[in-house]
């Protein structure tokens, strides 16, 4: 039988090579991957942070595709992971006579962050085409002295073409566990399902096709006053947009939600929040990445 779906794997192991770049060390990596994953050229910023764009060469996902993405940060590593294009999930419902209900394309993300390491995972948006079925799972393990920043931007349908999600479904589960000497603690759990029902509901998305999440988990001993100051600055960012935004203070970090009609607005908002997080963490100011949409670069 001919297989019509992808089963792709990518494993990334980042570590500090102890080679000085002025007063900082440089994070490098080893990798192992199969199609459709392809790693683009990595670069470094002035803090030795490894900046790595990942490309999905197939151009999109269809029902039955399975991707496994594993990331490991050894001690004293700094990493910015992103993607070079939006992830497209094509329609599955009603396509096959054998399986008219369709099948989910799935991505499993396993992330392990060891002591004094910092991961920023900022992929571009996921577009769920009409009748697309997609499920993603994130399992993150993080030490008490490390941090994790993650953004997730979802567009339901191609609204410019008058398309909505129809019978499609987006599912996401994020689990973050904090490692310590005695036992592992649950740091954060988030589960989301978006469908036509949630898209049209007044108490849901109310026909706004773009939904975004930004999660930042900081070090266990990070200053609470700094977090409160960060929240005040983020609320000022909210005042400059006409979209729906909310923020929650976690035990160790923050959670931001975006709801609107423009992916560009969401990217701009999250970029500004990212700058504030870098600032409060004592890191260098982030730069707009060359693999991101060119039309955004002049507006940030």
Swiss-Prot record:
Transmembrane segments: none annotated. Keywords: Chaperone, Cytoplasm, Nickel insertion. GO terms for molecular function: nickel cation binding. Its main location: cytoplasm. InterPro entries: UreD. One of its GO terms (cellular component) is cytoplasm. It is found in: Cytoplasm. Pfam families: UreD (PF01774). HAMAP family: UreD. Required for maturation of urease via the functional incorporation of the urease nickel metallocenter. Belongs to the UreD family. UreD, UreF and UreG form a complex that acts as a GTP-hydrolysis-dependent molecular chaperone, activating the urease apoprotein by helping to assemble the nickel containing metallocenter of UreC. The UreE protein probably delivers the nickel. This is Urease accessory protein UreD. It comes from Prochlorococcus marinus (strain AS9601). The gene is ureD.
């Amino acid at each position: 039988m001919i297989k019509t779906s992808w089963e792709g794997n990518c494993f990334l192991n980042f570590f500090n090579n102890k080679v000085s770049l002025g007063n900082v060390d440089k994070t490098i990596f080893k990798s192992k991957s199969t199609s459709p994953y392809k790693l683009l050229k990595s670069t470094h910023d002035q803090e030795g942070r490894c900046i790595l764009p990942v490309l999905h060469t197939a151009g999109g996902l269809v029902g039955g595709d399975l991707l496994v993405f594993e990331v490991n940060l050894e001690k004293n590593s700094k990493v910015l992971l992103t993607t070079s294009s939006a992830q497209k999930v094509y329609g599955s419902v009603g396509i096959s006579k054998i399986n008219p209900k369709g099948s989910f394309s799935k991505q499993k993300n396993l992330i392990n962050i060891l002591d004094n390491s910092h991961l920023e995972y900022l992929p571009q948006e996921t577009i769920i085409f009409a009748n697309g079925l997609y499920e993603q799972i994130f399992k993150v393990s993080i030490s008490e002295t490390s941090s994790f920043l993650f953004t997730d931007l979802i567009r339901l349908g191609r609204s410019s073409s008058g398309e909505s999600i129809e019978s499609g479904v987006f599912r996401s589960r994020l689990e973050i566990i904090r490692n310590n000497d005695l036992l592992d603690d649950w740091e954060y759990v988030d589960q989301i399902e978006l469908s036509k029902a949630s898209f049209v509901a007044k108490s849901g998305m109310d026909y706004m096709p773009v939904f975004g999440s930004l999660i930042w988990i900081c070090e266990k001993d990070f200053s609470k006053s700094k977090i409160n100051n960060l929240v005040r600055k983020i609320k000022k960012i909210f005042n400059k947009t006409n979209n729906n935004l909310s923020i929650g203070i976690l035990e160790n970090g923050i959670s931001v939600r975006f709801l609107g009609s423009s992916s560009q607005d969401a990217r701009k908002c999250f970029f500004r929040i990212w700058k504030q997080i870098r600032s409060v963490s004592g890191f260098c100011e982030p730069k707009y990445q060359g693999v991101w949409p060119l039309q955004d670069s002049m507006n940030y």
